[in-house]
Amino acid sequence: MAAQIIEILSPEEIRRTLTRLASQVIEKNSDLSELVLLGIYTRGVPLAHQLAQQIEMLEQVKVPVGAIDVTLYRDDLKRIKTRTPAKTKIPLSLTGKRVVLVDDVIYKGRTIRAALNAVTEYGRPQVIRLLTLVDRGHRELPIHPDFVGKILPTAAEEQVKVYLQDPDGRDTVELIKG
């Protein structure tokens, strides 16, 4: 039986969702000069850049954006055959900053746990918050996003795929069943 693909978010819905999320981040961070967005590779990075653009449009403030590679911090390294060099790029010390980790989908919470471990190597932030475009549930760790674009209850065997203009050439979120 062929997989069934259901569009969950259209390009317009993604745009509106990112605008709403940017507004929520602004509301929660009165001093935007202390804010840093860290996108988690792969699709968290372009999402973080889009959020920074939205914040700049709304508040005329440039927010620094970094990229974090959690590969070497994962607790399932034994299952990973190849280890790539870390692609982490953080533009400044995180000590005293208000960090928002940005990821496309949260599932079990293991990627976020790895990201938290990675962040502490770049300083001691004042606070770390989590923003995710899609929360599909099924957490194995006590991790809960502070900002969520869409809550999407799924079955364990289903997949959620996020496609973004950069790097995929289109904006859409799909649920894949079967």
Curated annotation (Swiss-Prot):
<keyword id="KW-0804">Transcription</keyword>
<comment type="similarity">
    <text>Belongs to the purine/pyrimidine phosphoribosyltransferase family. PyrR subfamily.</text>
</comment>
<comment type="function">
    <text>Also displays a weak uracil phosphoribosyltransferase activity which is not physiologically significant.</text>
</comment>
<comment type="function">
    <text>Regulates the transcription of the pyrimidine nucleotide (pyr) operon in response to exogenous pyrimidines.</text>
</comment>
<dbReference type="InterPro" id="IPR000836">
    <property type="entry name" value="PRibTrfase_dom"/>
</dbReference>
<feature type="binding site">
    <location>
        <position position="83"/>
    </location>
    <ligand>
        <name>substrate</name>
    </ligand>
</feature>
<dbReference type="InterPro" id="IPR050137">
    <property type="entry name" value="PyrR_bifunctional"/>
</dbReference>
<feature type="binding site" description="in other chain">
    <location>
        <begin position="103"/>
        <end position="111"/>
    </location>
    <ligand>
        <name>substrate</name>
    </ligand>
</feature>
<feature type="binding site" description="in other chain">
    <location>
        <begin position="42"/>
        <end position="43"/>
    </location>
    <ligand>
        <name>substrate</name>
    </ligand>
</feature>
<feature type="short sequence motif" description="PRPP-binding">
    <location>
        <begin position="99"/>
        <end position="111"/>
    </location>
</feature>
<keyword id="KW-0805">Transcription regulation</keyword>
<feature type="binding site" description="in other chain">
    <location>
        <position position="160"/>
    </location>
    <ligand>
        <name>substrate</name>
    </ligand>
</feature>
<dbReference type="GO" id="GO:0006355">
    <property type="term" value="P:regulation of DNA-templated transcription"/>
</dbReference>
<feature type="binding site" description="in other chain">
    <location>
        <position position="136"/>
    </location>
    <ligand>
        <name>substrate</name>
    </ligand>
</feature>
<dbReference type="InterPro" id="IPR023050">
    <property type="entry name" value="PyrR"/>
</dbReference>
<dbReference type="GO" id="GO:0004845">
    <property type="term" value="F:uracil phosphoribosyltransferase activity"/>
</dbReference>
<keyword id="KW-0328">Glycosyltransferase</keyword>
<keyword id="KW-0808">Transferase</keyword>
<dbReference type="Pfam" id="PF00156">
    <property type="entry name" value="Pribosyltran"/>
</dbReference>
<dbReference type="InterPro" id="IPR029057">
    <property type="entry name" value="PRTase-like"/>
</dbReference>
<protein>
    <recommendedName>
        <fullName>Bifunctional protein PyrR</fullName>
        <ecNumber>2.4.2.9</ecNumber>
    </recommendedName>
</protein>
